[in-house]
Structures are given as structure tokens and as C-alpha cells.
């Protein structure tokens, strides 16, 4: 996290007004910049967030190319270090919107299917462990693992990138599991950047 990030952005934003550059009052200035789309100043401060997710959702997150990432490597480390593979929630496909799913699968059906998934995952991790015991390289053994396998990401970006990422991925059409992550990230952002949060009208989101 950039120390005193909002104060730093305000200081840099006043680069052309050196007589007033050290003015600690930055709320109005940053609010003006957000309102009028002067985004470059928000590239002057950064935040890093640790994210625990699955390989399937990580692939969506890694598409945001304005960020830099460091991810747990299944080539170099045993995947068991991050815990058991979680059985996913099950939702039905929205027939009108391919980017949407509906939480309307009957409970009995969900339980039956999740039991099958749990058995499938158990067989997959047993095979992975056997391959490792047989001396197969981790970079090869990992190919038997499902997209639900846990992973850990460190995601670093400018305040500008975080604002647009949170706006985009909070919207309808983002997968629920990804939206859950964004809600947690937004809570962190609100704590660390209260002035920006107020200007963005995110206080009650």
C-alpha cells in the first residue's frame, strides 16, 4: 500500500501549483478529479491484495492486464499446501444470458450432484498424490487437477485500476464467485481510501 496514498495523490495532482502543493486538504481535489474523469492522478498510488480463490476464477482475474500478479505455482509446490479442493455451489444455466446463472436447482438434486463431484475430486487428488509418489514432476502431475483447485494470488494495481476493476466486476454478468471476491476487495478499498470511496458514492455498497 502506498503510504498516505490519498495525501500523496493530492500532492502530485497539484504539481502545476507548487505554492499550494503541500495543502493537506485533498478531498475536494480528488472528488473533482473523479467527477471529471481526470484519472491519471489515481495512477500515482498502489494497493496489493492477497486473494484466495480457485484456478477457474483466477483465470478471470488474471485477464485484468493493468495489474501485476504473483500466483502460487503448481509447478514448484504441492497443491495440497493450499488445502482441500472445495466442492462448488451449483446453479442452473440462464437460457437467455450466457453470462448468468440462476440459484434454482432443487436442494435434493444439488446434494446428489455435489456428492458425485466430491468423489470425483477425491479420485483426482488421489491420482495426483500417486503421481508425485511415483516421481512424476509437479508440473506434469498438476494436469489431473480440476479448475476448482485452490490457488493464491497477489494482485497489485494503481488506485485507478482498482476503481475500474471494482466497478466492472461488481456489475451483472460477473460470475458469483468472482463477485464475492470483489465485495471483499471493495471493503478493503473503502477502508484504505475513504476520500475516494466518498467521491465514488461507494459508502453503502
Where are these regions (language model features)?
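Family-specific signature for flavin-dependent thymidylate synthase
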Residues: 1-205
Amino acid at each position: 500500500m502506498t503510504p498516505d496514498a490519498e495525501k500523496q495523490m493530492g500532492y502530485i495532482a497539484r504539481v502545476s501549483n507548487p505554492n499550494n502543493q503541500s495543502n493537506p486538504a485533498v478531498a475536494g481535489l480528488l472528488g473533482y478529479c473523479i467527477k471529471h474523469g481526470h484519472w491519471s492522478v489515481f495512477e500515482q498510488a498502489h494497493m496489493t491484495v492477497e486473494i484466495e480463490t480457485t484456478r477457474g476464477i483466477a483465470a478471470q482475474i488474471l485477464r485484468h492486464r493493468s495489474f501485476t500478479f504473483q500466483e502460487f505455482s503448481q509447478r514448484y509446490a504441492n497443491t495440497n499446501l493450499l488445502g482441500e479442493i472445495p466442492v462448488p455451489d451449483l446453479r442452473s444455466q440462464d437460457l437467455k444470458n450466457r453470462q448468468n446463472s440462476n440459484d434454482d436447482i432443487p436442494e435434493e438434486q444439488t446434494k446428489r450432484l455435489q456428492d458425485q463431484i466430491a468423489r470425483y475430486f477425491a479420485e483426482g487428488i488421489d491420482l495426483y498424490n500417486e503421481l508425485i509418489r511415483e516421481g512424476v514432476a509437479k508440473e506434469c502431475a498438476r494436469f489431473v487437477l480440476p479448475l476448482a483447485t485452490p490457488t493464491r494470488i497477489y494482485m497489485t494495481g494503481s488506485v485507478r485500476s482498482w476503481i475500474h476493476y471494482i466497478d466492472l466486476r461488481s456489475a451483472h454478468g460477473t460470475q458469483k464467485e468472482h463477485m464475492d471476491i470483489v465485495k471483499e476487495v471493495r471493503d478493503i478499498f473503502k477502508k484504505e481510501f475513504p476520500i475516494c470511496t466518498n467521491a465514488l458514492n461507494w459508502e453503502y455498497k
